[in-house]
């Protein structure tokens, strides 16, 4: 499980920390409080790109021996000290990213 955070939300948190004396010498996890598996993310992307018109099939490699399977950051300090909560959902991030990537592909840039 991983937490995916929109860069604009991260920038907001950084600005809040820069302008808050209570943030000096403190550490913050700047993240959403919602976790997703890689399969969850793949399904979301697939549905946004293809809808239900095509079946999604998975192929798996062996997992990395020392991979952390579940990463759940505590966002308590960011909320309590900075007043920060990530606002942008992963679905909203994908709605912005997918057209941008499609455009770059159509221009031959990727």
Residue ranges and their predicted role:
Residues 1-110:
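C-terminal substrate-binding subdomain of Rossmann-fold SDR/epimerase-dehydratase oxidoreductases
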């Amino acid at each position: 499980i991983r937490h995916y955070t929109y860069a604009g939300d991260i920038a907001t948190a950084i600005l809040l920390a820069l302008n808050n004396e209570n943030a000096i010498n403190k550490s913050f996890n700047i993240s959403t409080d919602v976790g997703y598996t890689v399969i969850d993310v793949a399904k979301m992307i697939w549905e946004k790109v293809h809808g239900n018109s095509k079946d999604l099939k998975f192929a798996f490699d062996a997992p990395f021996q020392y991979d952390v399977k579940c990463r759940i950051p505590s966002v308590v300090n960011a909320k309590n000290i900075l007043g920060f909560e990530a606002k942008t959902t992963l679905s909203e991030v994908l709605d912005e990213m997918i057209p941008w990537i499609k455009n770059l592909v159509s221009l031959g840039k990727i």
